[in-house]
């Protein structure tokens, strides 16, 4: 367990920083950079699990997720070349609740939700919202759905129209910009706005408890589909968390959203803040993020049966 390697300082650093604190101001920004080279100690502290949804052997995944009580620490810090965004567990729980509210209203109970988004905090909140409804996330391109024998999704969420599952009953487009307040431009007919249409929903959602054996995640790739149950995701997160035991923050730098979500769950299971990097982030930004947040990188683990990809 070592900090992300690299002694070199980046030549340029992000110029925009945002912090989502315990008061819900979803897009409060500041022009003051948090990247102060004079800081000698990281700001991120370990997460207290006291406010989390109580763990249950029947549905262990819910016990990992943040709640409205988790307001005193950042649970997620997002880094891209242009910005740094902090989200407390409280704010993440509100985004998840609003997302769950939209899914329940538009797609019904325990929906199958296709998520075709790049790694980022928005992709994470769509997964969290789906799991609050007791639903199942399908991640990957829409094309393998039929060939893989996977059920058609009730909803499809993407950042471009061509990535939407064409036969999904509900289609949602999410802007790529982290701080966007809505889709940029005209939406196709009957397609929902993944920010503007989410915001009116309530800040709280009573989680639907379901069995540990119920499928939580389906990975779509190469004409196949690999399922992971809610219990398997929770067990995998616990096993991965042991590789960074005692860390206050975990660096998550992976090329796809599915692995990013799994790594974030592992960080949270270990009581750490997840420091999530844009997939296109250069090495210099990764070094900056690791230094500023006191983050360590999780060692890769072999692919486990039924999980479909390494952590």
Each language-model region and where it sits:
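Surface-exposed beta-loop interaction hotspot
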Residues: 167-232
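Conserved ATP-dependent adenylate/AMP-binding module captured primarily in the ANL superfamily
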Residues: 138-191, 238-249, 280-310
């Amino acid at each position: 367990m070592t900090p992300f390697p690299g002694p070199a300082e980046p030549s340029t650093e992000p110029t925009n920083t945002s912090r989502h604190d315990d008061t819900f101001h979803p897009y409060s920004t500041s022009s003051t950079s948090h990247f102060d080279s004079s800081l000698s100690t990281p700001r991120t502290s370990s997460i207290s699990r006291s406010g989390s949804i109580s763990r249950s052997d029947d549905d262990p995944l819910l016990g990992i997720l943040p709640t409205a009580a988790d307001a005193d620490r950042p649970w997620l810090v997002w880094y891209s070349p242009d910005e740094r965004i902090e989200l407390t567990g409280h704010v993440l729980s509100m985004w998840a609740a609003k997302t769950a509210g939209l899914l329940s209203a538009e797609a019904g109970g325990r929906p199958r939700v296709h998520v075709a988004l790049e790694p980022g905090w928005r992709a994470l909140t769509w997964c969290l919202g789906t799991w609050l409804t007791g639903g199942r996330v399908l991640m990957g391109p829409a094309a393998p759905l039929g060939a893989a024998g996977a059920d058609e999704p009730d909803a499809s969420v993407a950042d471009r129209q061509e990535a939407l599952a064409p036969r999904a009953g509900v289609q949602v487009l999410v802007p790529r910009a982290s701080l966007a307040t809505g889709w940029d431009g005209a939406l196709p007919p009957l397609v929902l706005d993944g920010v503007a249409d989410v915001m009116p929903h309530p800040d709280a959602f009573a989680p639907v408890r379901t069995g540990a054996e119920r499928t939580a995640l389906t990975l779509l790739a190469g004409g196949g589909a690999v399922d992971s149950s809610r219990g398997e995701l929770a067990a995998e997160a616990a096993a991965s968390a042991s590789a960074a035991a005692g860390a206050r923050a975990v660096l998550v730098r992976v090329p796809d959203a599915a692995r990013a979500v799994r790594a974030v769950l592992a960080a949270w299971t270990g009581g750490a803040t997840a420091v999530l990097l844009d997939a296109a982030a250069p090495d210099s930004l990764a070094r900056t993020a690791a230094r500023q947040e006191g983050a360590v990188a999780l060692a890769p683990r072999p692919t486990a049966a039924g999980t479909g990809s390494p952590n």
